[in-house]
Amino acid sequence: MAPTGSSSRRKGGPASENARPADARGAAGDALLRQAKRYPDLLSDQPETAGLADNDAGLADVIYDASVRRWLTLSALIERAGERPMARLEPVVRASLLAGAAQIVLLDRVPAYAAVGESVAFVKSRGGRRASGLVNAILR
């Protein structure tokens, strides 16, 4: 099925300064990146899903909603695994870890290997190449 546009889809701000997200995890990650930059002031935001297939738009929304709803729980798990406070991590790393952890811990239909791989790819694509090993280690 070809991707279709939907006027009822929720949209956040610009996906990133460089490009629109090409997939659900990128859309969710970009919205979480905006939130991570503002934390602890979490505002109402949603992934930019225009141009994504309906199932990808839905996945982006589910990842984002689960991450924001359980932000503190996921942060505690990430801090325990990474042995460092979330506040010391770059926003792109926090966003990637939150999205990955939400998929692994809260979403039962997402394989762990896919969540880890896509989280590493997200952080690399947003300029965090050096941090990709950290994301991989914490989520595994």
Annotated model-derived regions:
Residues M1-R140:
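Class I Rossmann-like S-adenosyl-L-methionine
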